Amino acid sequence: MVKMGTVWDRTVDVMNGRAAMLASIAALTLWLPGVVRQALALAFVGNGTATPAASGGALGLYFLLSLVVAVLAIFGQLALIAVASDPATTRGEACRTAAARLPVAIGLALLFALAVFVLLVPPIVPIAAAMPHPVGMTPQSMGVAMAGIGAGARAFTGLYMLVFVVVMIWLAARLALLNPVIVNERDGVGSFARSFRLSRGLTWKIIGLTILLGIVSAVVILATQSVVGIIFRLILGADNLGLVALLTAAVVAVATSALTVVWMSFVAQLYVARREASDAG
């Protein structure tokens, strides 16, 4: 029987013993790319209106950079899990493992995204059919579309989306160990089934912990953004709002990166504990 308290204690031990290695990986793969993307976004968008430079190839560059940042984030998460799974793993070994398993992780993520898209088709069809303009979805057109469909279709859409959210929460819990499985077991599509088996009996615990961590993360991020933003604005003045936004984003990125390290370390140790219990049983 896996106890979450024991797993959390192991997680704390991992973060205390391997803090420097975890921090260096997070800084290079999570924090720095995110800050660079934010700087580029501020260069393209001033006070909410796209600048002339953003109308051409610059937006394509930003989109490409966003893809690179997303890939680096996946790479960083895999490397963090590799470090947190085995105390003998070095930084170089963790990075090599992450690089080797990155295509699998991206492929499974795309496969999951495709499945989610397919599940979203039924409620989208009646809304799209009632859209006044086939191209360009806006809040106003969405409102017109929802008013234009029948009561039965609205009820179906609302009920479907409610069930969809519940299913997504359940799936998120059952797939919480997917990345640790990808890193440690060298499997492909079978990683989905393996994650389901390892998370059996832990679903509600994982959901509860995820909700708790989500609340804590939201509070930390909002508090950091508000307090740091005010401090930087007082120091730099109202004439440097772009720099204030960039520095605030950099500090907030530190908080989000730290929270990611905590979660990756936890799921890695949860995987280790569950695998040990499974092997013993």
Question: Which residues make up each language-model segment?
Answer:
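Hydrophobic alpha-helical membrane segments
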Residues: 1-281
